[in-house]
Amino acid sequence: MHSVRTSTTSTSSMVSSTMHPFDAFNAPQPYQQHHPPRWNIHNPHFSQTNGHSIQKTPSMIKLHSSEGTVPTTNGADTLHQRNMEEKIISAPLHYITGLPGKDIRGKLISAFNEWFRIPDEQLEIIKRVVGLLHVASLLIDDIEDSSKLRRGFPVAHSIFGIPQTINSANYAYFQAQSEVLKLRNCNAAFTIFTEELLRLHRGQGMDLYWRDSLTCPTEEEYLDMVANKTGGLFRLAIKLIQLESDVEDDCVPLVDLLGIIFQIRDDYQNLQNEQYAKNKGFAEDITEGKFSYPIVHSIRSGAANCSSGSSELMNILRQKTDDEAVKRYTICILEKTGSFEYTRRKLTELMAAARAMLAEFGSAEAAGLGGILDFLELKE
């Protein structure tokens, strides 16, 4: 023990207060163990450098160690590796984009550009941004909603697993962010991108909270949530287009209205449309326990009239049932409370307001948007 203390004291005296800090690393260290170099010499073609050797081949560089060969690929192999990784990471995204769909958002962007007339290069960037965010949101929504089908096919996480699907969706968010930085007014575009994604997640958060806490929102609260959630990508697209355009018209109010129309129409079709049932499953919103627009109306109107249907609806939503008989009974409750009729009237009212807004612009270039509104009309 005495000799140990002596050795330590001796070393300390060599690293004096006047020594440059980095010189301390060169001072003798107590109990320092010397090991042979980690990398062994196997290549006769190169001279030794500090006990290391490197073997070079046309396709790769190999470092030989006691634990095996560690390859470091050259440029061509690195590119191939990156491409393979990209395919793996993006597989859930590519799966969803490969499913049949109407691309309503892409068509909407093209329709708005009929009068904003931004360059094709900028337009394609905006389409990629919105497309990536849309597909990412579908991947996450299907997980959060425990969905089984997407456009008539198994949801992505049923094929790739939940962790890989979440990672792929997150990857798409940052791919979209990198695309935004390619726009001419990239600083302002990045601010818009951030603001709208925050609004989208606030809306989604409230939708999930109401469902999981079994809290029925008011109609006003519901519409505010939809404006944030569903209107987010519509609004992001038009704000970026307006930012890149010399045309000074403000179409954000119209886009907000279109987002609400789109979501209420989707809620209605989830419970009433046979084709929707084939693509997503019969009355999936009931299985999810979601407070969709017709259900909010039925519960609120039933509570006001002291109807037993209101409490029955709440109990059914709590079950998150997949029983078709129970779901058909739920639809009967909605019919009795006039909730489907109320939803149709609301859509007619909103559609008229949207057409009036469109007419105010008085532009022949708005024909494409008129076609979008025609598509959104309910077909009974």
UniProtKB/Swiss-Prot annotation:
Residues involved in Mg(2+) 3 binding:
D266
Similarity annotation: Belongs to the FPP/GGPP synthase family.
Cofactor mode of binding and number, as noted: Binds 3 Mg(2+) ions per subunit.
Organism phylogeny: Eukaryota, Fungi, Dikarya, Ascomycota, Pezizomycotina
- Whichever gene encodes this chain, its name is cle6
Q: What is this protein called?
A: Geranylgeranyl pyrophosphate synthase cle6
Kindly list the positions annotated as binding Mg(2+) 2.
Answer: D141, D145
- Disordered: region residues: 1-55
Say if the entry is tagged with keyword Transferase: yes
Biological process (GO) annotations held by this record are: alcohol biosynthetic process; isoprenoid biosynthetic process; mycotoxin biosynthetic process
What's its catalytic activity? isopentenyl diphosphate + dimethylallyl diphosphate = (2E)-geranyl diphosphate + diphosphate; isopentenyl diphosphate + (2E)-geranyl diphosphate = (2E,6E)-farnesyl diphosphate + diphosphate; isopentenyl diphosphate + (2E,6E)-farnesyl diphosphate = (2E,6E,10E)-geranylgeranyl diphosphate + diphosphate
